[in-house]
């Protein structure tokens, strides 16, 4: 009953979305469908549920603007590589990832026990060489797909049920129905994440901002912006595509 009510609320709260940005939604859906197999190959390497991962970044696909992204990629290349995040910190790529977001994520990953088992390590030093390598990864869609996998692994670890010793300490993200995992993971992705340690992240903190409508999308004629709940859009997409 609770899940049915949640899905009904998602539908009611975002029905206007596909009507006002119908073409962008359809274009994003086609793009996701055509890239799904390639994304799945990446996400499965890191034991990340590919349906959840795709839904988490779907709203960014709806908003994506090629020409704006090209300009921002150029700005990040010329500003971030030599000067760090103070030089430039634009979100880039289809998944709209900021260098500062990725720097924090890499550091959290390298503090975890997952880097060695998955054979994935990062140079987190404050050097131009490390920033160049990071930019190269961010400029690649496969690189961004790997970062999303890393993000979700860390999110499910820090906001999961188990502490570092494997003791159950809370009802974590892993215990929720998939559509709710999507809603909360997407909200955290959009709002920013406070990295903790295993089992210590507060889902209530994420829930507190889930309903906030701060994600801007243009209307059909791109004459003005309307603001949406990022988590609700992601959950709606999941319900449409994967939870039929």
Feature locations, PLM:
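Non-catalytic cell-wall polysaccharide-engagement segments
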Residues: 12-15, 37, 44, 104-244
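Structural recognition of the beta-strand scaffold that forms the well-ordered cores
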Residues: 55, 93-96, 188
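Alpha-helical transition-metal enzyme core signature, strongest for iron centers
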Residues: 60-64, 101, 189-193
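Export/targeting segments at the very N-terminus of extracytoplasmic proteins
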Residues: 13-90, 142, 146, 159-176
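Generic structural microfeature
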Residues: 7, 51, 92, 143, ...
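Bacterial N-terminal signal peptides
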Residues: 2-8
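Electropositive, surface-exposed helix/loop patches at the edges of structured domains
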Residues: 87-96, 100-104
